[in-house]
Amino acid sequence: MRFTLRAHVSTVTDLKPVSHRQTPHLLSADSKGCLYLWNLISRRPIASIDLKTHIIAIEVVGQGLYAALARDNKLRFISLQEESRLTRINDKVSRELQSLEIVYEIPVNCLNFANFALQDLGLRNYRLWCCNTMDAESIDVYEFQLGDRQSFKRTFNAINLFDSVAGLAEAKQKFRFDKMGIVMRFIVAGDTVFCGYESGVVVGLRIRDKSLQICYASFAHYPEPVLSLAHDRTERRVFSSSTTDQVCVHNIPTPDLPVVTSVSGIQVVANAGTREEVINAPLKKIGHLAVLNDILLLTSWHGYVLGLQDQKELFRYRKERNLLCVDDSTDGQAETKKEKPWINPGPIAGIAHSTDSQLVLEKLPIGGHRRLKNFLEHKWYITGYNDGTITVSQI
């Protein structure tokens, strides 16, 4: 079973399942700045906001609170409001939707298309990891209290990991670059933040007693860039992908490892260069990864969406084009535009059933009751596409 969500009119850049609500919901963003909150049972958006700038990445922060990083160099915190307004979905359709409103925003460098990482420190305090203001090869770390604009402070400025990473024994055997390259991806995995670089290096970072530590470093993707990172919370590991067919598995280091050296003020713990496991996927150029229980989800630049279970192919899907595009040539004759026969997939996510959702079964109409029951009984993967559509597919 597969159904399609339609509201975006430009490339879907990111999507995140929302688990804080009683029924399954989804948050999605696009390259024109539209952000939608979807009810996956009614299959319609229930709230929206137009930021009017390319949204790079989004995160679900908490109950009714979301974060969006955009190309205008701002990270916005957005809250779901109770009041509704008439919102135009496209040229023909308008719907009554709840409001999403900006409640807090801070400046963040977007020189490249890296995402961001947020660590919840409790009591509405957060730690933000992102690219440095002036140098996309370096990292800044900020701490702030949500809603207090005076609390925003940079705790680490322009962190460049090259000297610390290049000093590892594993790096000396393999690493031949004179720099790490730009930061491509961030992801939070418990108390560790993993960073993927243009050079193919994946580094795990922690903050201990106000000191920055390198607790993990992998060179498996070198010299190809890291394209995606995904956190497997069940098995305490992180997956990474690149332009090759290799997906690397990085085990999250145990806490409180002994520090063996310090380079340029950055601590390096024992065995930071531990070897990683490598999975050979049946295709290359894996742009996005996600984990759903024991299933690894991925999308490829070749148009395929793939599911792997125990390193075996569980499913494969490609959304084919069904219409020909026609361009006018310079001599006035219509010419068929040559395009790829498929629509490029982008971000992917997985959703498994939640027993909490059964609390609202009695409040739904018969049709909604049936759809929710079916949704809870299966696993689903959700894919955003370059044409603005989002497919929700049953596994």
Curated annotation (Swiss-Prot):
Gene Ontology, cellular component aspect: nucleus
Keyword Repeat: yes
Gene3D superfamilies, per the entry: YVTN repeat-like/Quinoprotein amine dehydrogenase
Domain of life: Eukaryota
Residue windows of the WD repeats: 7-48, 221-260, 343-386
Main location (coarse class): nucleus
GO biological process: chromatin organization
UniProt signal peptide: none
Compartment annotation: Nucleus
Task performed by this protein: Component of the ASTRA complex involved in chromatin remodeling.
Family: Belongs to the WD repeat ASA1 family.
Protein name, UniProt field: ASTRA-associated protein 1
Origin species: Eremothecium gossypii (strain ATCC 10895 / CBS 109.51 / FGSC 9923 / NRRL Y-1056) (Yeast)
Annotated gene: ASA1
